[in-house]
Structure formats: C-alpha cells, structure tokens
Amino acid sequence: MLNLVQKIIGSRNDRFIKKVSKTVQKINSLEPEFEKLSDQELKAKTQEYKDRVAKGEALDNLLPEAFATVREAGKRTKNMRHYDVQLIGGIVLHQGKVAEMRTGEGKTLVATLPAYLNALTGNGVHVITVNDYLAKRDAELMSDIYEFLGLSVGVIVADLNPEQRRESYACDITYGTNNEFGFDYLRDNMAYDKEQQVQRSRNYVIIDEVDSILIDEARTPLIISGASDDSSEMYNLFNRLVPFLEKQEKEELDEDQEQKDFYVDEKSKNAYLTEKGYAKIESMLKKEGILEEDDNLYSPHNITKMHYLNACLRAHSLYQLNIDYIVRDQEIVIIDESTGRAMPGRRWSDGLHQAIEAKEGVKINAENQTMASITFQNFFKLYNKIAGMTGTADTEAFELHSIYGLEVIIIPTNKPLIRKDHHDEIYGSVREKFDAIVEDIKQRISKGQPVLVGTASIEASEVLSTLLKKKKIRHNVLNAKQHEKEASIIAMAGYPGNVTIATNMAGRGTDIILGGNLEVEIAQLEDPTPEEVAQIKAEWVKRNEVVKNAGGLCIIGSERHDSRRIDNQLRGRAARQGDPGESKFYLSMDDNLLRIFASQSMAERVKKGLKGGESLAFGFMSKVISKAQGKVESYHFDIRKNLLEYDNVVNTQRKVIYEQRQAFLDSDDVSEILADIRIDVAEQLFHDYVPAGSMHELWDLEGLEKALKSDFMIEIDLQKLYEEDDNLGEEDLKKFVREAIEFEFAEKTKNLEVGAVRQFEKFSLLQSLDSHWREHLSSIDHLRNSINLRGYAQKDPKNEYKKEAFELFSTMLDNFKYEVISSLAKIRIATEEETQRAQEEWKESMSEIKAEHESVIDNNQSEDDKEQEEAPKVQQVKREGPKIKRNDPCPCGSGKKYKQCHGKVVD
C-alpha cells in the first residue's frame, strides 16, 4: 500500500527535491547576468550581501544570489561549475540537513555554497573532516573561491600553537577535524586567561562524512586527563596469571560439561569468570602473596584487583594483534573497526589499554584521571545549526534524526548510476572464500579491469596478500600499517589491471579515477612541457577507455561488515560520475557477522549442504545477512543511545560549570560573587552546629568555635558572648558569625593593592572550581561503572544514576564554595606580580598538554580516550594555617574525617 501511495504522490525525498528545484531554476536564471560582471563587481557582491544581512535580510532570501555568486567564482578561479544537483546539495546543507551524495559527486565543492552564504553573518562557519590531511586538502582546494570573494579561510590541525589556532578560528570559514574542534572547546574551558581561549561562538557547522563522525565515533568521547598512580606491577602480575585460565566455548555453556574458568560474550566484548575460575585465580593470588589465606576476591577492598583481572582477561580473550590493534614503535596503536585506520593517541579505557601493553610486552603507561570530557553528540549540539554530507546515510536516517534532529535527503546523481551489484557468494570456510576471491581477481585483471578488495581486518588483508603473491599477482596493500602511502596508492588504484587491498575502507575521501589520477601524474613531473602534458593526457584517455571496456572498477568485499552502511561505502567507490563499475561480496559461514549473529542451526545446515569449494548465491541468504546486520545495527544503536542518556546527565552539569567558569573568567572583579558565597558558607556552617529553630541545649557552640578557628583563622568565644547577653538569639549569633568572616577578609586585604586582590580572588575561584570539577568527574566515572549493579536490587539504574549524579553535583558545588572561602582565609594573598607570574607558568604548562581520544569498548564504558599530562600546579600562594586534607581527622575533635564533618557541603 505504501509503495502504491509513493508511486502516486512521490516519497518525501522526491517532493523535497521537486520543491528546491524551483530555487535551482532561480539560480540558473541569474547565471547570464553574473557572467557579465567584472571580477571587481563580482567580489563587491560579498560586501553588498553582508550589508543586507546586517539590515535584517534573511539568508534564505539571499540564497539564489549568493549561490550564483559562488558558482561564478568557481568557474573563474577553479574552472569548476556547480552542477544543478550540487546546488540542491548546497540548499540541503544550508537548511541544516544531511545530504547523501554518491562518491565522486563533488561534496567538497558543494560545501562552498552554504559555507559562503552562512559566513555572511560574520559569525563564522566550521567545516569538519575526518583527518588532518583532508582538512588541509579541502581548505587549499577551495580557498581560491573564498578568497576571490573576499572571505578568509583557516585550517585547524594538530601541530598549531594557540595563537595560530585563534587566527584560524577568527577566519570566516575554518576547516579542521572533529577531534581538534572538540579538544579546543575543552581546553578553552580550562583556560585561566581569556587570551588563552582560541574559539569563538559555534554558529554553523558542515560535517563531511557525517555518518562516520556522528555515528561511528559517537561511542568515543573526547577526554583530557592527567596521569594517576603507577599500577604496572599489577597489570604484569595478572598478565602472567590469566593465560593459566581455561576458556569455555559458547556451545559448551548450555551443555552438561565440566565447568571451565571463564567464558566470553563477543557481542558486548566482555569476559566473565565462572565460580571455578574465581577459585583458581584466588589460589594463584594467594601463592603470589597478593591475597591472605582467609581473604577472597569478593571482599570490597579487593575491587581494584578485580579491575586488573577483568582488564587482562579481556585483553587476552577478546583483542587480537593486527585485528584490533598493532604494535608500532613499542606502543599499542588502536585500529578503527569502521575505517581500518591506525589511531595513534587513542587509548582504551577501564585499564584495557594497560592490559594489552602488558600482554605485548611494551611499556605500560599509567592510567589517567579525567580533567575534562565531552561526547561528540553533545559537542555538536552546541552549534546553532548542524549540516552534514556523506555517501551513505540513508540506512542511519532514523538515528541521525532521533539523536541530532537531522533529516537525510538523498541527492540525485549528476549522471545515472550504472554500477552492477552481483549477488553475494557464500562458502563453507574462510579458506575456500579466499581461494574464490583470488580466482575472481585473476580473471578480471586478465582483461584489464582494476580491482579494489575491501577486507575487515589487517590480518585478512595480509592473508589475501600472501595468496596473491603465490599466484604472482601484483597488488598494493592499504591498511593501518601503510597509512602514509594511502593517498598515492588510491590515486593509482584505477589503473588497468591494478589490484588494491584496503582494510575497512581506508582511503575514503579520495576518488578512484578510471585509468589513474591524471592530475597526480602531471603534478609528479618537474616543469613539464606542453608536449609532455599532452602525451600524458593521451595515454590516460587510452587507459580510461581500456578500463571502461573491461567493466570499470570492480569492488570485491571479503566479508560483510556489521553495518550495511560500511558495505555501501565500499560499493560506492565504484561507478563514480556515470562510469561503469561492479561490486560483489564473498562470505563464509565462519565470518564474524554470521558466526556471532546468525543462528547456529542455520549455519550447520548451510555447511552440511556445501561440498568443498561450492558456494551459495541466492535471495534467502541475503535475507539472513540483512537480518544479522539489522541485529548488529540495532545493538550498536542501543549502546549509543544508552551512552547519550547517561552523558546527558553530565552534560547538563558541564554546561552549568562551564557557564559559571566563563563568567568568572570574563569578570575583572569577582568580589561580589565571593561576598555572596561567604554569606552562603557562613549560614551553612552556623546551622551545622546550631540547627535552625532548635533549643539552646542542642547548640554546639564549642564545635562552631573550633570550625571557625581551623577553617577561617577566626578566634571567637561564642559561648561567652551568649552567656553575657541573655537576649542574644539564634539570628543574632548567625549575623555575628557572618560579620566575623566578612571582617576577617576585609582586614586581610585592606592594605593590599586592589588589583592584586581582585586578580588573586579570580585565580583562586578558577583553580578551586577546576579541582572540584575534576574530582567530580572521577566520582561520576566510578558511579557510572557500578550503577548497573542496582538492577539486581530491582532499581532502575538510569534513574538511580540521575539521582545520585545530582547529589554528587550538589555536594561538589557546596564543597567548592566552602573550600574557596576557607582557602582565602588561610593564605597570604600574593602580589599582583606573583599572581601574573603564576598565570604565565600555567600558560606554559597548558601549551604542553596533550589531548587524546580513547576508544570505548562496550556499553559499560561511557568514556574513552585519555591521555594528557596534568598541568603542574603553580605556587602563587603561601599558607598561614596548617593544611587540612579531606581524609584527615576533623580538627573539631568529633572523630570524623574532615570531609564528613566541617569539610562537608554547604548551600
């Protein structure tokens, strides 16, 4: 019924394309007029548009003229004219939607249209790419158009200093990676000086490969962190013990067989000890002297040992060298499961990275304490408007809309797509599958057809490479180990008879041109003569025809990915811009997708029905594969949604802290803020010892005196005051305490320079807030990792998390207030020169900070990547009273810890 309705009235996508086609006609009608303009007249259009925007004209009204201007500038500077479908793509992006455009349709050129239009407001436009190479390339390619029209272009890459970053962000249009933009946001919210902040407002962002960034990267929050205690000995110990544990296979779990030591869940990438395994590891730990004879792993004080054990168990049973990671320069480098790229700098969390370092015998780096973090979901929601481009988003349209509010519009191709997609072939074993792939490659290259083989792991690419070498078939391997050669290998992948093996779509972002990349060939020549260029072009035309006649680029997939979208990305490398092309996937029943997610009974039936070397290729198996992929996609969507629901709690708190922190940073005088905090602190302190509305017998004036002396350096005999004045009531005493705290601070600062006092107050506020926020993030991490246990008590973990996270946040804010007032009371205020010197030291330390992007492994891990050395603490103050640590006995004599007595929260 739905198909019938769509045939009559068209789909929503068709209706949208039809509607915006009218705007495209308007743009086309302006082309003859704009062609007549001189260069100066065309350039002057930019200022004209800016003036009109400043007077209140909407960007939508300007769109036809602005797009016509950019199209004309493209023709004059790059000899590139925007096609009508590219204009449609530009309109989609301007409207804050996702444009799905096939490979080779010119997404980089499309972005110039909405980028120019939205830059006219003066609020800046950010264009996000997946790596530094593409950010630099796209900025350089399109800068001629922007600069011709009077707009400035900046690029943000990893090696820029703060001043260079600030200049790039100040440009009208700024290119960069999602990691760099996100880390700069976090660093700006750690700055102690406005001059150290580099970003301005987040106005409009265009995200290239939006599916990769907003979906594949959604489980990997950005985290800035500092090193914690060294625990390498414990990781080395458990790394030695874990190999003695025996794994229980999946098929043995439901059978009446003798229990083994542990089993794994490959879907969630977790490993679980059995009771036998617990007993075995306890026995080994007692022999090692780590556990006492009467001790056990279930004891609360052994929770850290369980942390090391679990990490090492997962490292040995679930993570494999050359599949999940590689060892490069004596470091563990994670391999992105979606792209096959090596990701230097990223680290797994929850001790997994340290466990793998121990497993591979490389240096174990310390675990880290989170200093600042944010997920990509919540970072991009900070922008006023988000838009995205990709070749494959339609399969993830629901997630993009439900989480980001982004509608996906499929843009028609400029020329009809004529790729031939063959049925999948399914073999009984991996070896039979690879043999069939090699035979297919051999036949195709014999007629001059280039082949791109997509594999799911480095191990698979190397196995296939070995088989091709045995057959003496020349080929290039493109995976995480050859990342540096990526662009040059891809540029020539379209040569007649060339064979290229790429792991999980490494090389995405670079077009494969039939016959090879002509521009790259010409660029490699030194001072070529016109004759040489003409000869190269003639040779390329011949090669191009040979490849087209052979069927175009052939894509071979060595297995299906968990996601249909990744498969479509691989297919999309063929048949660009109306060229011919083919695609075919080879599978085996031992592939991870079918092994983990297809039913065991079905797999056994298929294997029994296949004789050696035989394959299946019919519709039934396609349904099985689609169903398996649907299960995985649904599973991963639930994980991302779950992560977002938990992170939204912290995100609300983050906004409060960062807004308050920015208010401190922007203010030259925080004395009024501190005065309000002193009132809050005095009142809460008073009521800790004198309960509101209580009888005198319940008052603890002696305890209040001790607290005032130890925490605020104030000596008052409150008991004597009360005894001398019978009319002195609760409110009078409270007022007295408040005025005593105010008087003490006024006395301390009355002979000091006002500028020094104001600067020092501000610095103290920022330092104290940062310190408490870091501690709070650590507490939230521990809460997040343990909250699922509440389910055993018939409680909803998410509701419990929200409630306890709020309580932790309230406690943190109260502790912050109390500590900052107490600290200011105890220390000698530094001179203005000392404070400035401390700030300069802090700036230097911040310039050395590194930020890393860790990888989340399962749904129990809400953070990821951590590495970054904590800034050295500056010594800008001197303490007059003794420092009371939070776990020290409270000086009031109650016998409680300070944090549970006078160091506790106040309103």
Curated annotation (Swiss-Prot):
Q: Where does Zn(2+) bind?
A: C890, C892, C901, H902
What keywords are assigned to this protein? ATP-binding, Cell inner membrane, Cell membrane, Cytoplasm, Membrane, Metal-binding, Nucleotide-binding, Protein transport, Translocase, Translocation, Transport, Zinc
Q: What is the uppermost EC class here?
A: translocase
Its Enzyme Commission number(s) read: 7.4.2.8
Q: List every stretch annotated Disordered.
A: 838-907
| SMART domains named among the record's database cross-references | SecA_DEAD, SecA_PP_bind
What does the UniProt cofactor note say? May bind 1 zinc ion per subunit.
Question: Could you describe the subunit structure of this protein?
Answer: Monomer and homodimer. Part of the essential Sec protein translocation apparatus which comprises SecA, SecYEG and auxiliary proteins SecDF-YajC and YidC.
Q: What is this protein called?
A: Protein translocase subunit SecA
Naturally occurring in which organism (per UniProt): Francisella philomiragia subsp. philomiragia (strain ATCC 25017 / CCUG 19701 / FSC 153 / O#319-036)
The gene it comes from is secA
